[in-house]
């Protein structure tokens, strides 16, 4: 049925998604502060009333995926029974990581543990006390651990099954075919695909915005480039141009190569801080991270602050993270499925949950503990600009500036951040084009570049 109804780029999908995005942008520009306040009010209401749903829903998804992982369905292959994986494990992981986490890791690596240690989320602990620091790592590991990756894995698994096992079009709506039946090819399915495009664009906009702020901060600290809007617009244009070139070269030449460079640069930064920083403390934090995470996860995965001990905290942190990640999930899930054809369901779940989580724990242990150690030795060196003044984008570069060879490591960090965002935009363009066309590789190059 799916093969006989090959879907091409659809006007309803394209124009409904593009129209909504344009109306949103025009309204934001036209009404300025009023529009921003309206968006903030809507977001605040959703967070206040549905934090329980975000937290409980993501945790329920994790339990579901664990059940699938250990069941007989774990042996199913995403594709024909004789399909082989297209990418090796290292390349596969690099591409998974670049699409799912990317520069977010560099943005929050030093900043989030420092924020929570300075302003403990709960428990009445003194700022920067031992208890506050332990709790800071508990929440950081929770936010960037298995739960974040669960949000990507579920749609990726569903799309991978229906597209590669059931031979349906490469669209987000395909995973809703059990609910929609034949209507998946009609207006309901097309509107779901348009929603996937909108979510991808909005999720990417948040990430690119954070990335531009961090790149701008790094250039300011490294080369004294002024923190002004024209510079930031120039950064956006440069990244967009680079992403356009990358997407034109295709998945194997663009995303694959950049992903490998990204993960190599990330590991180099991690090793550098580990060896030149308080090595024994960092090794101890890495070792303890797995125990801290395993011990705190069963409680935190269902904690919603129902007694209102810290009003608004979830809306700023956990619920915001999950909402933001859900916006990303159609794109990242589809991309995960695209590069995982030929792998079993068990391989897919294990690879998209366990490997990235392990890497995240190590990264945050190194950069978070290094930042806290620096703050303990020189109070205010990081908390004043990053926490009190809210200049989170400079956290990584302020940290690296206190280490030797900053001209080298700071430049490397900038290059890695830029490459991560080029990879994200490249991958998003490929996936959005698939949502609109239902095909993996048949659209003209200028379609993908246009997206």
Predicted stretch roles:
Residues 1-132, 248, 271:
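N-terminal alpha-helical transmembrane segments of multi-pass membrane transport
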Residues 1-5, 171-186, 211-234, 266-272, ...:
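Helix-loop-helix connectors at the membrane interface of multi-pass transporters/channels
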Residues 2-5, 37-43, 70-89, 114-138, ...:
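Flexible loop linkers connecting adjacent transmembrane helices
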Residues 6-21, 181-190, 225-244, 248, ...:
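Loop-to-transmembrane helix boundary motifs in multi-pass membrane proteins
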Residues 2-6, 31-46, 66-86, 136-143, ...:
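Membrane-water interface regions at transmembrane-helix termini and the short interhelical loops
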Residues 5-8, 12-15, 19-29, 62-67, ...:
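Helix-loop-helix module between adjacent transmembrane segments
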């Amino acid at each position: 049925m799916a093969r006989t109804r090959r879907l091409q780029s659809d006007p309803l999908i394209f124009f409904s998604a593009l129209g909504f995005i344009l109306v949103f942008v025009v309204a934001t520009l036209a009404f300025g502060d009023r529009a921003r306040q309206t968006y903030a009010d809507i977001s605040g209401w959703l967070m206040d009333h549905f934090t329980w749903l975000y937290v409980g829903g993501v945790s329920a998804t994790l339990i579901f995926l664990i059940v699938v992982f250990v069941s007989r369905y774990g042996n199913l292959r995403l594709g024909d029974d004789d399909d082989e994986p297209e990418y090796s494990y290292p390349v596969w992981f690099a591409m998974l990581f670049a699409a799912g986490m990317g520069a977010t890791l560099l943005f929050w690596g030093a900043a989030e543990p420092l924020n929570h240690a300075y302003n403990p989320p709960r428990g009445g602990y003194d700022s920067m006390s031992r208890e506050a620091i332990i709790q800071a790592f508990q929440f950081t590991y929770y936010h960037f651990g298995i739960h974040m990756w669960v949000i990507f894995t579920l749609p990726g698994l569903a799309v991978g099954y229906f597209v590669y096992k059931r031979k349906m079009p490469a669209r987000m709506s395909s995973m809703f075919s059990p609910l929609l039946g034949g209507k998946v090819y009609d207006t309901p399915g097309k509107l779901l695909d348009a929603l996937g495009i909108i979510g991808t664009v909005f999720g990417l906009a948040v990430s690119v915005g954070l990335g531009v702020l961090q790149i701008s901060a790094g250039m300011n600290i490294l080369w004294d480039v002024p923190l002004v809007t024209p510079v930031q617009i120039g950064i956006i244009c440069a990244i967009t141009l680079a992403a356009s070139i990358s997407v034109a070269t295709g998945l194997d030449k663009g995303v694959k190569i950049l992903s490998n460079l990204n993960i190599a640069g990330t590991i180099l930064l991690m090793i550098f801080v580990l060896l030149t920083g308080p090595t024994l403390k960092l090794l101890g934090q890495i070792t303890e991270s797995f125990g801290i995470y395993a011990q705190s996860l069963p409680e935190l995965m269902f904690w919603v602050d129902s007694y209102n001990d810290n009003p608004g905290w979830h809306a700023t942190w956990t619920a915001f993270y999950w909402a933001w990640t859900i916006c990303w999930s159609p794109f990242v899930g589809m991309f995960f499925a695209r590069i995982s054809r030929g792998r079993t369901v068990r391989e897919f779940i294990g690879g998209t949950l366990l490997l990235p989580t392990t890497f995240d724990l190590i990264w945050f242990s190194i950069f978070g503990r290094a930042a806290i150690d620096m703050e303990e030795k020189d109070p205010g060196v990081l908390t004043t600009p990053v926490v009190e003044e809210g200049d989170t984008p400079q956290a990584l570069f302020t940290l690296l500036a206190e280490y030797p060879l900053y001209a080298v490591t700071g430049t490397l960090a900038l290059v890695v951040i830029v490459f991560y965002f080029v990879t994200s935009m490249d991958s998003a363009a490929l996936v959005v084009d698939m949502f609109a066309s239902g095909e993996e590789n048949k659209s003209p190059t200028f379609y993908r570049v246009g997206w």
